[in-house]
Amino acid sequence: HGGGQNRLGLGSKAEVLGIINPDVVASPNLIANLVSELLEDDVAIAEAAQVPMEHPKDYDRNTLETTFASGCCMFIKQEIFEQINGFDDINFFMYCDDVDLSWRVRLLGKKIHFVPLATVYHDHRIDESSNLVVGHAEFYYSALGGLLLSIKWGNQKRTEQIVNSLKTDPSYSEVYSEYSAMVENGKLPQATVGSDKVAIFTPTGFADYRWTN
């Protein structure tokens, strides 16, 4: 995911880059609403709202500021994308790479805005109990990405909790095997300087939630 975005975005002559999942349908005013938010000098990323299943992370209702942008649909200033060298496609294949990118943007002192009027339909499957259906790739890479994010952003307690969970839960055996191989081969991410200034870890994820299931 991140590697493909980097190949297209790094070195681009565009002023704004659109990071958009292939399983979304844009609303008519999506581009105008996101680009207009980026007219503010200190705003580096503008994030779209997802429907019908909105992302639950919180945002400031007055300023629209939020702590990270979902890679489902966000616009980022190309100069900022260039400055942080895009997505970290060395440590993240997909999932949590958007959080990592967002936090590195915030380390620059830039802001991320959630734009409720900029909407995309994000295709999801739910089961008969209205629970989100998660495929193997999402299950695997989201678990691995969450672990690598906690390592890269210096949350040792969270890292230990995740590793213990992966080790004892048979459903995560593939993820634990990959982690063990990374440890053996010295492939774990290096800790980020200044992580305490921007990184947020909560029981539900990487931001405060407006609601929980």
Task: Go through the PLM ranges and name each one.
Residues 24-60:
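Conserved donor NDP-sugar-binding/catalytic core segment of glycosyltransferases
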